[in-house]
Amino acid sequence: MKKQIATGYKMGNITTAKAITFFDVETTSLDPEKSAILQISIITDWEDGNQDVWTTKIKPRDVELNYASSEALKICGYNKDDWEDAPLFEEVAHIIAKKLAWGPIVAHNINFDIAHLKASFKRRKWREPERNEKFDAEKKMFKIGYPAIDTCALAYIYLPTERQNLDTLREH
């Protein structure tokens, strides 16, 4: 019997893609409505073999740190001094929006990353384009690429181990 994976974000076909984008976010907690993104990494592999690698720390606002999980901060290696010169989310939002606008996108536990990105954009009054509206990051629009591929869901299907975290996947 084939396993079915329920995800909140659509997965799809990547056979016609000109590029594929991998991304990961590190956050201050598990709750996207209260947490801040501390770091984001985005890697785009283009069909011509070129690769675009972009990563940045993101300085959280003090109010966002009020809801931070000490365990999440420890996992991310957060300390105020190392993040002092990092940009605020709104200073790099247009870069993130442009890099993630075109599919396919890949992440491990992608629903977590997408939920945190959408919440961060919306807190800064960014919006998703209306149907048939042209995407424009300069107009404070964000769009998450499609299809979305979740390596955690794939690991659950194809690597039935006790854990599906990235450390376990690296071992196989």
Give the location of each predicted region:
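Long, highly charged low-complexity segments
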Residues: 3-14, 25
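A generic local structural motif
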Residues: 6-9, 91-94, 134-135
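Short acidic, Gly/Ser-rich segments with clustered Asp/Glu that frequently serve as metal-coordination loops
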Residues: 25-33
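Metal-dependent phosphoesterase signature
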Residues: 74-95
